[in-house]
A protein has these predicted regions:
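The feature marks the mature, well-folded catalytic cores of soluble enzymes
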Residues: 1-268
Length: 268
């Protein structure tokens, strides 16, 4: 199944502040390397997998706008805009809102509570797994359920290094997710297992390599080239595995999924 993805070129990507444990202004981005890694991901989507990629223009002064996953959530053609917790990222919202409006997304909601888009909300079949509390508030989950008409399963994250849900959980296919168990409370891990027949447990090494920050269509999966255990696991499952370097973006706490927002059509 071909996906449609929203990305943002990394023209202004850099470490200008520290808002998560990965970010250190003393460890700056190497711009040429970041551009090459972003382009490699873009080319995997478009050339290897045949997915469609739309681009939102990068804006000066918004270095993390490259992480489009936080720019919204699209389910069934309905849009949820982010309400960023960190002041450093709040300026991104009008630019994402303008892009979505121009693209024809006329039904939109911005929650009253903090919510950071697809980074904290992953759709698995007809369930929406939603993370909290580092960047999104649990009360926002009720707003998502009402607006999108889906069942929301709230998952509490426990480790600040895995501050968005998409850093600790991958939607692999309609039967399977991959998780890093130490990133969740016992109750949240039990909730995942109660709903999903197959749960792959990632090692600490693979989780720290941002191997769970991945994109899958059920047959093909794109993930960090340093997550060697998960790469082998997916290959043994018969999937097309597309490893790619993302270490420049991990300096800012981002990876493959952070750089990618899925644009689902009505009914999807």
């Amino acid at each position: 199944m071909s996906k449609r993805i929203l990305m943002c070129p990394p023209e202004h990507f850099d470490i200008e502040y520290e808002i998560n444990p990965w970010m250190h202004v003393s460890d700056p981005v190497l711009p040429a390397r970041a551009r090459a890694q972003w382009q490699a991901l873009h080319d995997i989507y478009t050339r290897e997998l045949g997915w469609q990629v739309a681009l939102v223009p990068p804006q000066p002064g918004l270095p993390d706008m490259v992480f489009t996953a936080n720019g919204g959530l699209v389910v069934g053609g309905r849009l949820v805009l982010p309400r960023f917790r960190q002041p450093e990222r709040q300026g991104e919202t009008p630019w994402f809102a303008a892009w979505f409006a121009q693209a024809g997304y006329t039904e939109s909601l911005q929650p009253r509570h903090d919510f950071e888009g697809e980074g904290d909300a992953l759709l698995w079949n007809d369930l929406l797994f939603a993370g909290y509390p580092w960047r999104s508030d649990q009360p926002a989950h009720r707003e998502l359920a009402a607006w999108l008409g889906v069942t929301v399963v709230s998952l509490q994250l426990t480790d600040a290094r895995f501050y968005h849900l998409d850093t600790a959980l991958t939607i692999v296919d309609e039967h399977t997710v991959a998780v890093y168990p130490p990133a969740f409370t016992a109750d949240s891990l039990a909730a995942i297992r109660a709903h999903v027949p197959q749960v792959i447990e990632a090692s600490t090494a693979d989780a720290m390599a941002y191997g769970l920050n991945a994109m899958s269509d059920g047959r093909s999966i794109v993930l960090s080239d340093r997550a060697t255990g998960l790469i082998e696991c997916y290959r043994q499952r018969g999937m097309q595995v597309c490893p790619t370097p993302i270490d420049e973006f991990q300096k800012s706490g981002g990876g493959v999924k952070c750089l990618s927002l899925e644009l689902r059509p009505p009914g999807g």
